[in-house]
Amino acid sequence: MVKNFLGSSVTSGSAGAEHGKTLQIPTLRWVRQSKTSIMALVICLGRIVKTALVTGGSGYFGELLSKQLLRQGTYVRVFDLNPPGFSHPNLEFLKGTILDRNAVRQALSGIDKVFHNVAQVPLAKEKDLFWSVNCGGTQIIVDESVATGIEKFVYTSSSAVFGAPKSNPVTEETEPNPAEDYGRAKLAGEIICKEAMQRDGLDVAIVRPRTVLGYGRQGVVQILFDWVERGLDIPVLGGGNNKYQFVHSDDLASACIAASNVKGFATYNIGAAEFGTMRELLQVVIKHAETGSRIKSIPMGPTALAANLASALGLSPLGPYHSLMYGRAMYFDISKAQKELGYAPRYSNSQMMIETYNWYQANRASLGKGGGSRHKAPVKQQLLALLPYALRLIPG
């Protein structure tokens, strides 16, 4: 048993079993040395220190978010199938799946804020998992958050809920129109959160990021970097003059944390403040790499059809969303987040692309050890590996 400042006794499983007596405000050193959860200390401090559950906290973004929370003095519990790739005295790991209601309930014990990041991403391609994890898993943790009385629930959604927008910039009032299963499942998660807010009063913030870049990011972007590093030609669709916005993982983490500190339901679109066209961005990384890669334009329609066919046959790592958006303009109006959250992105498209490429070059030898996260691991190029050589047939 652990007593908080108010004198009420709170049971802390391993603490009671291990010490067999009531403890008065144990020190952080005691918590580190014992097998007691760090959350026991937070309970006994009368909830002065905030506690956060980060689902998917061992994934690419979840791990960066956890680190930023820890730097701000928050106690963090990571709920994931894989352990995080770092340690910290105020970090706790709980292994489990978002589809296990009992495990989710256990993960929420003693938590103030939830950052829900677990998702099957477009690279996964397993349509059943899009729905069971992105939708069913979100329903479970939302239900249990309501039952537990969570202070704030932050849901990391996706710009994929908008599909290929008819006009830009996209605002929070733009009607969602997902074009493939990943976007539909993420939108379903948003609806679950809104319904819990309306029905049960759950305080929810929905954060929709643009495509994420930053140190440690692999996935599809690693294919681009491999081609650039080898001096191979790089494709753009329809000239590459589509304005395309990214967001740095650190800027996204800052936005999520800021959203967790604002009371009341809100939705925020998050992206870079400075960005240009896809062609301009590729020229930046090619110039930085100094490897002689050239940009070659290929037609959008036939390329998208071929890409979707290769994906359907399991011959390409790209999903439908990749081929849909690569040649289309997509960028957010971030003024709402700037006004309400004080959101001030530090990275432009060019800066984050160069940083991500530099990280890739510095860590090539250890790539492939990213654990279970698809964004922390390289992907197999499959049939896509032939594309740069086919581009040699195009003049320019």
Curated annotation (Swiss-Prot):
It comes from the Bacteria. Its cofactor is NAD(+); NADP(+). Keywords: NAD, Plasmid. It holds the Pfam family Epimerase. InterPro entries: Epimerase_deHydtase (IPR001509), Lipid_A_modif_metabolic_enz (IPR050177), NAD(P)-bd_dom_sf (IPR036291). Putative nucleotide sugar epimerase/dehydrogenase. Belongs to the NAD(P)-dependent epimerase/dehydratase family. This is Uncharacterized protein y4nG. It comes from Sinorhizobium fredii (strain NBRC 101917 / NGR234).
